[in-house]
């Protein structure tokens, strides 16, 4: 879908601002998809740095939000940092995926990543020389399962889910 085109999603729960495209998931869909125990392990690659794995686990949740803990590991599973806990509302999680219509295109794409095969909504946001691409798995509400950032066409950062544990 080109920026500025009328989106197919008509539910108000997906559109947080009139000048933004609909988000891939509503706050309620994220809540349902991120019960305690939901864990995502993602391989992070940053230009000029060693690869590492970022682990995010939902610890608890209620009608308003969730507490999660996150830490980093080596690709072999050795812990690099201690878990840090944070709490966000479900709406705050949703707001991370709210993107300006004037800078963003939405498409559909199937991806094969180490965490599995997913039918995704692909959001591509262009800001000057920066292109950020987010792949949100329809069967895995919450954070993107894959993310890439390019500057002047060069890949400078990526995060790819290597494991997606549903929890609950």
Residue ranges and their predicted role:
Residues 1-168:
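Acidic, serine/threonine-rich low-complexity disordered tracts
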